């Protein structure tokens, strides 16, 4: 009897679930593959969904829809449409999807998870704080962190050991962020897996794993309430990241002076205020956003560039020769812990266009984030082409599809750093997203990557441990990481 009732209710649920999907399939809707009850189109995706969705675009067009279980999801594979959504019609695409994993931990605080007017307020506060940041302080902190990185690499090279790019580049970006936000120095001997860095790094890695793999319970409407309770009661890693930020706030307040600006934390305290728990949570969530969005992406970018330098030694030598020529023409780098004429500064960037193009081409050829962070529609909307997108639809830009679009890139499947030398802009190249809700820390990230990359190339030649090209396969997640690899460092003379 009970079993029969359960089966009956389950069948009713399947029919209702199917009807809710199929009733939307009309001539005004976006094209897309036929969804099945409960799973929608999830069954059609492999462990490399950005490839699957790029393939689907060949059949369904530049913009189409799929169902991730119950979540109506729009896939955009065209830069013109992407700009229409994220720039021209921004207010209709300002929000994040209202799913448990986005709400969990911050309750929509900070710059990443906040919605609507709350996000606009956060963006204004954070933007004001960042504009007040002393640029000389930023340049000096990056120079100092590069000195530590290069010194560590010299120690490894002289010992004959292999270099682990993921470990040391993650430590570099973590240390730079610690200095930028907290004005704290991380010892060059500190292990990423132990000590203060580990307090933040370990829960951050778990957060990335959760967001990268996703959960069916996030996109099944019937399970969302229970899944949110599960996240709140039985998972702690996001709260560990938030609480780490709170601990730093209270520590800062012990010596805080409104007229003294030591770091970004001081500026956030001044702009947000700390009178209420909500203000404290906003600051902590913003700090967490900087670490979660800025550390792994920059470290992975550098790791991928090192991989491409090994696999394309001719470009590695071209970059090295350009840097040497620039330092000679500019009278050397000067300052810092490295000797004069043997250190690249941010001011040398204009004199090293190939290095900059190499960086850009790597981000095009190997996009760091396959879809970026999702958006959600605030209301029904008709696009310029007459197609309809319903309220609460999830929007994903397929950056892999954009980067391999033959309309915008000649020979897109070929790695060619010279493609950005003649043209600084390409509408399909948007590594930091576009529009008002693009990456708030993009300038810092580009400075950080350039200064580290150029000084590594200046000081070392990178080789694979077996003389063969490094496997370029990437593992899917919130960021697309290469498979771990080691490097032989050869000191430049």
UniProtKB/Swiss-Prot annotation:
Pfam families, A to Z: p450
Alphabetized PROSITE patterns for the sequence: CYTOCHROME_P450
SUPFAM superfamilies, A to Z: Cytochrome P450
Record EC number: 1.14.-.-
Regions that span the bilayer: 1-21
Top-level taxonomic group: Eukaryota
Needed co-factor(s): heme
Binding-site residues for heme, renumbered to this chain: 439
Membrane topology per record: Single-pass membrane protein
One Gene Ontology term of the molecular function aspect: iron ion binding
Family membership: Belongs to the cytochrome P450 family.
Protein name: Probable cytochrome P450 508A2
Organism of provenance: Dictyostelium discoideum
Species classification: Eukaryota, Amoebozoa, Evosea, Eumycetozoa, Dictyostelia
